[in-house]
């Protein structure tokens, strides 16, 4: 047995020496570079996903925009690769989007399906741990996937009861993977800062490198977005989907009296890409009726891009 161990040790030593000699004699093009080693390490990291519970629509749009900007085609074993693994996040609204997991839901609840399309471009939008609790009262193995969950709590709006019930079932260890972010500002600048807070919380929590890379990339992108926004003068508001019928998805838009223009452009988007722009001009009757209705009914969310003469509702619709 001792002789066998000595032979094994000798083989390992010889192999190590051979590797070192190869590294010294190899051409510079074949030597592993630090950047390539770093990328390889990122590829070997366990799966990680950022989960958002009740996020503002603009935060979802900004993260989709970031994901589209940094997405690259890549391979790992068996081919060259470029960039890092994809940025993956799951936005989820409770209780509107809750049963899109099963195909039968398309017929049972078209409102929920359309809202899912609005927020996730046709993909599966869910917070796995929360959905597992609400659907089956079961636990999803968060530690296996490092699911970092951010709960958005709007000012003066209580956290939904089902969310608090779910939080009460978490163990002390599981609670370390959950953050509650309070927010109130609805301007584009406010939403940019809120999105950065989300990614920074994830980077501070995670023991892996990818979340920090996502944060630094978004900060760079955020600076360019801020400059673009300032030059365009657009303002973004929240939208509330009112109904779905044979003509499509209907969104309810409530604006204050001071922000309702007579002429504006409704911009229909798929994700962050404008699909079509429809100019609208309100007549006297329509304009003043809208003002009266707005004064009588104070609930609902706002949606639009108000740039002085133009005000466009930025709806993600398919």
Swiss-Prot record:
Lineage: superkingdom: Viruses
Region of interest (Disordered), residue spans: 1-29, 293-318
Comp. bias (Basic and acidic residues): 1-22
UniProt protein name: Uncharacterized protein ORF18
Organism the protein comes from: Ictalurid herpesvirus 1 (strain Auburn) (IcHV-1)
